[in-house]
């Protein structure tokens, strides 16, 4: 499976396969845990084997019942996930020409994981936040996140949190003039069409509103784009990294 991931990435085909498969790996670990087992050695490459195109985990070590407290059990499960992600982090770094930095979305994902690890989150929360990261989502899931964050931007209970994040985090500095003439002129025609349909300022709030509307137009009016993958690719090209930065600032 991981070989597929890299082949797909390198050939720039089927990015979707790439992302879902990584998510499946994390889900698979959750299934081991739900059976009352833990692995205990996922930091070591000797516990993985490739069979065909699939990466299999071998040498599952033990039973969570060996531990006396819930806290120990939770820590053990969490350690499995961090070990798996640590292994993948090293692996991506070594296999991608130029390292992870050459694949911005991948870099964002591992930065997120490393930040989440420092926050002492419960196992369930940690696993969910990691598995729901935009890097692991398909096009529709990624674009739907803009809808969710724009909803939070307007909802009374979350408005303040979103406003503070968007205005105070330096992560958004790069997006403050997202609507420059050169960007707008370079956009694919369906993106420009949605842009010209309303008045948008160069503020980050309006960028979020625009992306929400892009998703809305696709679903409500059948956009000229053809598929959500094409919409997602356009967004990833012209407004690269914005979704990942939103996720980082609004999810933890
Ligand atoms: C954009 O704003 C201008 C000035 O406020 C207004 O005249 C125009 O009708 C607006 N356009 C749209 C598409 O809302
Ligand atoms: C970008 O937004 C600013 C307002 O913040 C507006 O004056 C400008 O015309 C917009 N640029 C384009 C290319 O639409």
Please give the residue ranges for each predicted region.
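Catalytic-loop of the protein kinase fold
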Residues: 29-52, 57
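Regulatory extensions appended to serine/threonine kinase catalytic cores
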Residues: 141-252
């Amino acid at each position: 499976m991981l070989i597929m991931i890299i082949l797909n990435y390198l050939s720039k085909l089927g990015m979707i396969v790439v992302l879902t498969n990584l998510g499946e790996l994390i889900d698979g670990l959750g299934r081991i845990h739900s059976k009352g087992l833990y692995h205990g050695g996922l930091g070591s490459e000797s516990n993985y084997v490739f069979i065909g195109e699939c990466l299999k985990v071998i040498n599952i070590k033990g039973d969570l019942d060996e531990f006396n407290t819930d806290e120990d059990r939770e820590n053990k499960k969490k350690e499995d996930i961090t070990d798996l992600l640590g292994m993948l982090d090293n692996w991506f770094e070594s296999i991608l020409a130029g390292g992870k930095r050459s694949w911005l979305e991948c870099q964002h994902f591992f930065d997120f994981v490393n930040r989440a690890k420092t926050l002492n989150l419960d196992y369930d929360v940690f696993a969910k936040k990691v598995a729901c990261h935009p890097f692991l989502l398909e096009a529709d899931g990624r674009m739907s996140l803009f809808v969710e964050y724009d909803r939070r931007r307007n909802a009374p209970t979350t408005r303040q949190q979103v406003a503070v994040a968007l205005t105070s985090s330096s992560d958004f500095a790069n997006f403050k003039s997202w609507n420059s003439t050169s960007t707008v002129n370079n956009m694919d025609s369906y993106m420009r069409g949605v842009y010209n349909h309303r008045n948008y300022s160069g503020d980050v709030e309006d960028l979020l509103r625009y992306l929400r509307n892009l998703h809305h137009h696709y679903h409500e009016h059948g956009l000229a784009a053809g598929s959500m993958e094409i919409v997602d690719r356009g967004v990833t090209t012209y407004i690269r990294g914005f979704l990942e930065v939103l996720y980082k600032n609004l999810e933890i």
